[in-house]
Amino acid sequence: MSESQSASRDALRRARRVVVKIGSALLTNDGRGLDADAIGEWVDQIAALHARGIEVVLVSSGAVAEGMARLGWVTRPSAVHELQAAAAVGQSGLSQCYEEHFARHGLRSAQVLLTHDDLSNRKRYLNARSALRSLVALRVVPVINENDTVVTDEIRFGDNDTLGALVANLLEADALVLLTDQEGLFDADPRHDPEARLIAEGRADDPALAAVAGDGGALGRGGMATKVRAARLAARSGALTAIASGRQPEVLTRLMQGETLGTLLMPDHAPLAARKRWLAGQLQVRGTLVLDAGAVKVLREHGSSLLPVGVRRVEGEFKRGDMLVCVDEQGQRIAKGLVNYGSDEARRIMGQPSRRIEELLGYMESPELIHRDNLVIV
């Protein structure tokens, strides 16, 4: 192990607050309901970390698979309402299974179901953060899942890897651990290339990592591509991300002891401020602003506000306060932010200096299209 790798593993060993995401393949009997013994083993490891003073927040799949088993379904349905029904049936069983196993160690667990709306609304985001912080302070293990019963495709997180990263941001966790049925991230698909090598360590923002990521399996929605994106998102709050196989014995406790297992992705930059993390975590955007080269340069180099003069084109229909994405003229994402004007007004003032806003609109809400406090570089 190199000196830098040793330092990175030591950083994981020193982590005091960890978000652990366990995929459905590691919690179920190949989709035929929950594997209670496997869940018991995960709880044993989490309890061992608690005994070391490590705060653990668990993001757990398994509700849909449990619901499918209880309903007698063999294959995962494609209809959204059937998936929602399965989640509703299975969630209580999942929660009860965790509760019984944590009780063996004198620990309490709490079921927390979140939707993207909970984290996109600033007030609800802060409320969720306060509630989770209180649970952790009480030495209760939060067991978090997406509220599949009420969520729609348009506002879903998409997978529990992304949810885990957003929870890591929410709680300012030191680390995000993504446990899967694969050893980690490889430089090629190990199922088809016998020469594929495990990537022991990398940088979360390395664009080359996305090229070697694959798709998810039959039971879950998350493949390696989602795990790389999750690592990039978690890095915004300074969290490192470990991706490892949940098939290895005692993998969680061994990882947290600094053992070289799986892939470790380190953050590239200093942590974003809390409000910027919230902005960065917004998955739903209402429109797009296409920027000229000058505006791109100013945003990237100085983190300045976005003025109308730097906007070449406005796409989509939106209202004041909506989340927009800013792209360069080649379509590359530059930033996201909350806009000060609706789409009609934005089209009338784009490309114009701020001093002309009142002349063009009859009023001036703000000299900026997006203020720097409401803007995050992506």
Curated annotation (Swiss-Prot):
Give residues annotated as binding substrate: 61, 148, 160
Q: Where in the cell is it found?
A: Cytoplasm
- CDD domains associated with the record: AAK_G5K_ProB, PUA_G5K
Superkingdom, taxonomy of origin? Bacteria
| Known pathway | Amino-acid biosynthesis; L-proline biosynthesis; L-glutamate 5-semialdehyde from L-glutamate: step 1/2
What this chain does, per the entry, is described as: Catalyzes the transfer of a phosphate group to glutamate to form L-glutamate 5-phosphate.
Q: InterPro entries under this entry?
A: AceGlu_kinase-like_sf, Asp/Glu/Uridylate_kinase, G5K_ProB, Glu/AcGlu_kinase, Glu_5kinase, Glu_5kinase/COase_Synthase, Glutamate_5-kinase_CS, PUA
| E.C. numbers | 2.7.2.11
Q: Which UniProt keywords apply?
A: Amino-acid biosynthesis, ATP-binding, Cytoplasm, Kinase, Nucleotide-binding, Proline biosynthesis, Transferase
Binding sites annotated in the UniProt record for ATP: 21, 180-181
* One GO MF term: ATP binding
Q: Where do transmembrane segments lie in this chain? A: none
Family that this chain belongs to? Belongs to the glutamate 5-kinase family.
BP GO terms, sorted? L-proline biosynthetic process
Q: Name the Pfam families on file.
A: AA_kinase (PF00696), PUA (PF01472)
Name recorded for this polypeptide: Glutamate 5-kinase
